[in-house]
Amino acid sequence: MVVYKQLDEWIEHLMQCKPLPEENVKELVAKAREVFSNEKNVQPVKMPVTVCGDIHGQFHDMVELFKIGGTCPDTNYLFMGDYVDRGYNSVETVTLLVSLKVRYPERITILRGNHESRQITQVYGFYDECLRKYGNANVWQLFTDLFDFLPLTGLIENEVFCLHGGLSPALDTLDQIRELDRIQEVPHEGPMCDLLWSDPDERLGWGISPRGAGYTFGQDISEQFNVRNSLKLVARAHQLVMEGYNWSHEKNVVTIFSAPNYCYRCGNMAAIMEVAEGMDKGFQQFEPAPRRGAEGEVNRRTPDYFL
């Protein structure tokens, strides 16, 4: 049985960017599975809340995010997926977020991204990082099994619809999303896949996605979806935007990206969106945390050939 004192110790340990021992991860994930099992495909979220986009294993930048947005549980958070892959510290990043979820289940909402998948993590880094840090794939297996239970979308006060990717031609209403069976690996196609893979586009209607999964959707689609479901806004992540946030479709859609200097080379700002009482929306932008080497010195930006 995981108790608060134990969780607080784990969180303190993880905040130093140190992985938890495998047996602790196993205990944590068992408890987290119970928590996520009780959440819905469209998980209700109360305001005020701070909405965050992709993190991608950039642990020190996530710590910077908490400095700017406030610590959990003082601030209520909603994360829209992609905690792992690409960055150097996927293990510590996802373990900390899941620990916070188990410790403060009402103060942090963690949605599934397209990288919270067995197939994608075997290609983009999380699997290899688990092998490197634990000497086996057990922790990767524990987390990828847990990812199947993450809610697909969040709904802030019935007005702001939050998800990782975008809309689906197979889904007109939130009720249709509520009926999906989400407890599975991210499919290659279909409505659940689209929610995690699709992107807004300048072209109207539905389009074939250059990503090879999901669709592109135009302003006509997002406007219809918002009107039909009495929504004010679709908030999503999934795409690098240089300022950290980007409005599209005449403010029917906003993209939020929370990994600054993405992949340690893109030079972008990161942002979080604060939804206050009265549905006022404000953005906080931030730059990367200083990166420290093994001796504690601050490194220059890593040249491309080390990536």
Swiss-Prot record:
Which reactions appear under catalytic activity for this entry? O-phospho-L-seryl-[protein] + H2O = L-seryl-[protein] + phosphate; O-phospho-L-threonyl-[protein] + H2O = L-threonyl-[protein] + phosphate
Comment on bound cofactor:
Binds 2 manganese ions per subunit.
Output the Pfam families linked to this UniProt entry: Metallophos
Supply the name of the protein.
Serine/threonine-protein phosphatase PP2A-1 catalytic subunit
- Indicate yes or no for the key word Metal-binding: yes
Compositional bias segments (type: Basic and acidic residues): 289-307
The entry's family comment says: Belongs to the PPP phosphatase family. PP-2A subfamily.
Using the UniProt annotation, give all residue ranges assigned to the region (Disordered).
286-307
Disulfide-bond pairs as recorded:
none
A molecular function annotated in GO for this UniProt entry is: protein serine/threonine phosphatase activity
* Reported cofactor(s): Mn(2+)
Q: Which residues form the active site?
A: H115 (proton donor)
Per UniProt, the keywords (alphabetical) are: Hydrolase, Manganese, Metal-binding, Protein phosphatase
Give its E.C. classification number: 3.1.3.16
Q: Which domain of life is it from?
A: Eukaryota
Task: Keyword check for Hydrolase, yes or no.
Answer: yes
Q: Which SMART domains match?
A: PP2Ac
Q: Where does Mn(2+) 2 bind?
A: D82, N114, H164, H238
> Highest lineage ranks of the organism?
Eukaryota, Viridiplantae, Chlorophyta, Ulvophyceae, TCBD clade
**Which positions are annotated as binding Mn(2+) 1?**
D54, H56, D82
SUPFAM superfamilies according to UniProt = Metallo-dependent phosphatases
